[in-house]
């Protein structure tokens, strides 16, 4: 990682970073036709942050993502790229608890709001991991020399649920008959079914809103997605 920042004034700053991640050499399988791949990813960020008041600040970041799965001998697999943005808010104030001035802070970050990424020269596109995170913290002074801090955060992935292979198999049995064994290895047909279901046609912004109500098992599963 390479990072740096520049203060524009007393209340705002610019920052930039370059990240590179490599998995090294990876053997795709133990079969005779296995190949060795060298997947890697890199991202370049530029961000602006500003203190809007004594207790409130905000920041935005723009990001370029490049991802290469390393299948150099596979004409069907190409490197993917995407653009994304982050939005962050932070508030830090004071409240009175039992006669003690306590510090209460909260923060919200929505990251990777942006385009999809394709590894097959644009034929199909996948969602990048848009994520929302919200956190709270309370600092309470016990006495003149000691304080206690309580903090918690919640995380939610903002991408629509991808229809599973099991759903595809169930659909095929209902419409075409047969057994699960007839369809469980039909990955190309499964992908064609995904296209028919419109999964690849959902825009990134629509996917964010769709992610709040598309869990197969309803609201209970939506709550389980919050970590």
Q: Model-found features: residue ranges?
A:
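Subset of outer-membrane beta-barrel
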Residues: 1-227
């Amino acid at each position: 990682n390479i990072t740096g920042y520049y203060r524009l004034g007393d209340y705002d700053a610019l920052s930039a970073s370059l990240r590179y991640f490599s998995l090294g050499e990876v053997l795709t399988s133990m079969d005779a036709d296995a190949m060795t791949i060298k997947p890697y990813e890199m991202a370049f960020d530029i961000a602006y942050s500003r203190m809007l008041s004594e207790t409130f600040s905000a920041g935005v970041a723009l990001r370029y993502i490049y991802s290469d799965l390393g299948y150099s001998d596979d004409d069907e697999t190409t490197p993917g790229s995407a653009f994304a943005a982050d939005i962050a808010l932070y508030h830090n104030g004071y409240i009175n608890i039992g006669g003690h001035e306590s510090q209460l802070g909260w923060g919200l970050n929505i990251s990777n709001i942006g385009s999809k990424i394709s590894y097959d020269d644009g034929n199909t596109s996948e969602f990048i991991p848009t994520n929302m995170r919200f956190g709270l913290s309370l600092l309470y002074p016990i006495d003149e020399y000691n304080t206690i801090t309580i903090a918690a955060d919640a995380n939610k992935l903002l991408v629509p649920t991808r229809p599973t292979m099991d759903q595809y198999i169930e659909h095929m049995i209902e419409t075409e008959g047969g057994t699960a064994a007839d369809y469980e290895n039909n990955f190309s047909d499964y992908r064609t079914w995904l296209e028919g279901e419109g999964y690849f046609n959902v825009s990134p912004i629509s996917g964010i809103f769709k992610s709040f109500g598309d869990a197969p098992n309803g609201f209970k599963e939506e709550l389980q997605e919050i970590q």
